[in-house]
Design a protein with these regions (language model features):
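Predominantly a Rossmann-like dinucleotide-binding segment in NAD(P)-dependent oxidoreductases
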Residues: 77-83, 87-182, 190
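Short loop/edge segments at beta-strand edges and connector loops
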Residues: 17, 56, 171-173, 204
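A cross-domain feature marking catalytic cores of carbohydrate-active enzymes
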Residues: 35, 58, 64, 85, ...
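Generic structural signal for residues in well-ordered beta-strands
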Residues: 15, 81, 169, 200-202
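Short, solvent-exposed loop/turn segments at the edges of secondary structure
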Residues: 49, 74-76, 183-187, 195
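N-terminal glycine-/serine-/threonine-rich beta1-alpha1-beta2 phosphate-ribose binding loop
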Residues: 1-56, 62-80
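NAD(P)-dinucleotide binding in Rossmann-like oxidoreductases
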Residues: 180-182, 193-210
Length: 210
């Protein structure tokens, strides 16, 4: 069904049902990876091994080890690798960062970020055996939950503003509202600490109801 819908938009597009067949094509120079998180590393490494440049949707991978393997493959192959953090291309964010970095707002003493939503992330499933495949964001086997789906945006903005990466983090999360069989938290709270002592906070809930 998804392929049929896509072909309505781009009827002349060539369709592949296996990404490895796409990577074998000499007609392709680069790929865009917008699959669920747990597939990023496998696909990105395979693409670079096949001589393709890669634009990979955020978050990069499930853990630091996987991210490092992707980075080392980029270094070994010389293929361009870019992570799709869309705010890097947003003129509004670019302008604000210019203002921050030129001192318009003074010194950064602290950063507070949040992402609140009212929704369960759940999608309709036509058959029970497809539950974990379709609702992959709800399960730790396939997703890192709010941290990688939403928190990575806020951490990227904070690091961009600070022109540094935090060296300490603490946080906690829980499932307090959507008790529907998922095992990723539906609310989280984190504190990141930079070398100069500035703290970035991030809070997120997906049950922001009234």
């Amino acid at each position: 069904k998804s392929i049929d819908n896509a072909l309505k938009i781009a009827p002349k597009a060539k369709v592949y049902k296996d990404y490895r067949a796409l990577l074998d094509s000499n007609e392709i120079d680069a790929v865009i990876i917008t699959t669920p998180l747990f597939l990023h590393k496998e696909m990105a490494i395979a693409a670079m091994d096949a001589g393709k440049h890669v634009f990979c949707e955020k978050a990069l991978a499930m853990n630091v080890k996987d991210c490092w393997q992707m980075y080392m493959k980029h270094k070994a192959t010389g293929k361009i690798f870019f992570t799709g953090q869309q705010r890097l291309f947003d003129p509004r964010y670019i302008k604000v960062m210019e203002m921050i970095h030129t001192g318009v707002f003074g010194n950064i003493e602290g950063i507070h970020t949040f992402w609140y939503r009212n929704g369960d992330w759940r999608r309709n499933v036509p058959s029970p055996e497809l539950e974990r495949l379709i609702n992959w964001r709800l399960y730790k086997e396939y997703s890192c939950g709010l941290m990688t789906e939403l928190g990575c945006h806020q951490l990227q903005i904070g690091s961009w503003a600070m022109r540094a990466i935090p060296n300490k983090v603490m946080g906690h999360g829980a499932i307090t509202h959507w008790k529907d069989g998922r095992d990723v938290d539906d609310n989280i709270s984190c504190i990141y600490i930079f070398d100069n002592g500035v703290k970035l906070t991030f809070d997120s809930v997906i049950s922001n109801q009234f």
